[in-house]
């Protein structure tokens, strides 16, 4: 295989990181809704923690995207 095809295979594999981020964010918010339904008085604290967790999880997907773009255009 030449380097160009290996770059595109690596870029395709980076999609796994973006898929993982999407699953992580959906899991965080489904757990948030479930937790708020059980204990509405803890809504403010739960929302803060969920947004921090979602931001960190989404950062993984963005890093994966940046690495994929670096692989394609380098």
Curated annotation (Swiss-Prot):
This is ATP synthase subunit c. It comes from Rickettsia africae (strain ESF-5). Gene3D superfamilies: F1F0 ATP synthase subunit C (1.20.20.10). The gene is atpE. It comes from the Bacteria. The lineage of its organism: Bacteria, Pseudomonadati, Pseudomonadota, Alphaproteobacteria, Rickettsiales. The record marks 58 as: Reversibly protonated during proton transport. The keyword Phosphoprotein does not apply. Pfam families: ATP-synt_C. The keyword Flavoprotein does not apply. Keywords: ATP synthesis, Cell membrane, CF(0), Hydrogen ion transport, Ion transport, Lipid-binding, Membrane, Transmembrane, Transmembrane helix, Transport. NCBIfam families: PRK07558.1. F(1)F(0) ATP synthase produces ATP from ADP in the presence of a proton or sodium gradient. F-type ATPases consist of two structural domains, F(1) containing the extramembraneous catalytic core and F(0) containing the membrane proton channel, linked together by a central stalk and a peripheral stalk. During catalysis, ATP synthesis in the catalytic domain of F(1) is coupled via a rotary mechanism of the central stalk subunits to proton translocation. It is a multi-pass membrane protein. Belongs to the ATPase C chain family. F-type ATPases have 2 components, F(1) - the catalytic core - and F(0) - the membrane proton channel. F(1) has five subunits: alpha(3), beta(3), gamma(1), delta(1), epsilon(1). F(0) has three main subunits: a(1), b(2) and c(10-14). The alpha and beta chains form an alternating ring which encloses part of the gamma chain. F(1) is attached to F(0) by a central stalk formed by the gamma and epsilon chains, while a peripheral stalk is formed by the delta and b chains. GO terms for cellular component: plasma membrane; proton-transporting ATP synthase complex; proton-transporting two-sector ATPase complex, proton-transporting domain. It is found in: Cell membrane. One of its GO terms (molecular function) is lipid binding.
